[in-house]
From Swiss-Prot:
Pfam families: Cation_efflux. Gene3D superfamilies: Cation efflux protein transmembrane domain. This is Zinc transporter ZitB. Involved in zinc efflux across the cytoplasmic membrane, thus reducing zinc accumulation in the cytoplasm and rendering bacteria more resistant to zinc. It may contribute to zinc homeostasis at low concentrations of zinc. GO terms for molecular function: zinc ion transmembrane transporter activity. It comes from Yersinia pseudotuberculosis serotype I (strain IP32953). Keywords: Cell inner membrane, Cell membrane, Ion transport, Membrane, Transmembrane, Transmembrane helix, Transport, Zinc, Zinc transport. The keyword Transferase does not apply.
């Protein structure tokens, strides 16, 4: 690992740790304040801050575990733990949303007294904490770490939750209309639900070793046949992801090359540069696949592909 990469990882870890500590501290403070003031909006925003803490923790663990080398028992390393943590966090957040909405409906029809002043103070403090965390995560001009960017987006979305709690507090202080509290708590819960559901689907997809959603495997197979002359057919394609690393195995029927290793390198380079697949295991075959399972993930070149090949 290059020295610059090591310093970058250390910088990411420090910033994520600071943001995680601040967010978690204010999450606990907001939960206590919401319970004491009777504000469901604050409790809903606490759930939203929990999504931020979870996202920051996952990002922090991803940076940490990505520096661990694989061992004989964990040949891909430990990056799958972050995916498992994301799945558990998302499932817990969905449960929190259900509880908040249930309580909001109950509160709307049976209003409770809400202490507007403590609610407003805590909401403002939470907003300032989120602004500071967002600034910490975005500090630096050449930030490229996808985990840090994703965590920053979570914090940014939580700003809306803090603003919602502030609006509810101001309305209660000026008009005494307490139903605004459960109404805004439901709106905040919708934000939580959207993030939690997306996280649940993505983590579940990765745990099932699904292919990265942004890669069209049919297009990938055709691209290999079209852009690499010797490749006649692609089949037995398997693509999955561990953390941020994409892995692939495939069988390629090829014209017998003069240099086997050079052709293999060209295929792997193409997958790396066009699809960011950093680890590809390619089995090259000189005969057409004739076994019953050859149709699995199989692609033949376009009709016009070999018409453009000229043989001396």
């Amino acid at each position: 690992m290059a020295v610059s990469a090591i310093f970058s990882q250390d910088s990411n870890s420090k910033r994520l740790l600071i943001a995680f500590a601040i967010t978690t501290l204010f999450m606990v403070t907001e939960a206590i304040g919401g319970w004491l003031s009777g504000s469901l909006a604050l409790l809903a925003d606490t759930g939203h801050m929990l999504t931020d803490s979870a996202a920051l923790f996952i990002a922090l663990m991803a940076v940490h575990f990505s520096q661990r080398k694989p061992d004989p028992r964990h040949t891909f390393g430990y990056l799958r733990l972050t995916t498992l943590a994301a799945f558990v966090n998302a499932a817990a957040l969905l449960l929190i949303v259900i509880l908040i909405v249930w309580e909001a409906v109950h509160r709307f029809f049976s209003p409770h007294e809400v202490m507007g002043t403590p609610m407003l103070i805590i909401a403002i403090a939470g907003l300032l904490a989120n602004i500071f965390c967002f600034w910490i995560l975005h500090k630096g001009e050449e930030e490229k770490n996808i985990n840090v960017r994703a965590a920053a987006l979570h914090v940014l979305s939580d700003l809306l939750g803090s603003v919602g709690a502030m609006i509810a507090a101001i309305v209660i202080l000026t008009t005494g209309w307490t139903p605004i509290d459960p109404i805004l708590s439901v709106l905040v819960s919708v934000l939580i639900l959207r993030n939690a559901w997306r996280l649940l689907k993505e983590s579940f997809h990765e745990l099932l070793e699904g292919a990265p959603q942004e890669i069209d495997i049919n297009k990938l197979r055709k691209d290999l046949c079209t852009n690499i002359y010797e490749v006649r057919n692609i089949h037995h394609v398997h693509l999955w992801q561990v953390g941020e690393q994409r892995l692939m195995t495939l069988h390629a029927q090829v014209i017998p090359p003069l240099d086997h290793d050079a052709l293999l390198q060209r295929i792997q380079d193409y997958l790396l540069h066009h699809y960011r697949i950093s680890h590809a295991t390619v089995q090259m075959e000189y005969q057409h696949c004739g076994t019953p399972d050859c149709g699995i993930n199989q692609a033949a070149p376009a009709d016009g592909h070999h018409r453009h090949h000229h043989h001396e």
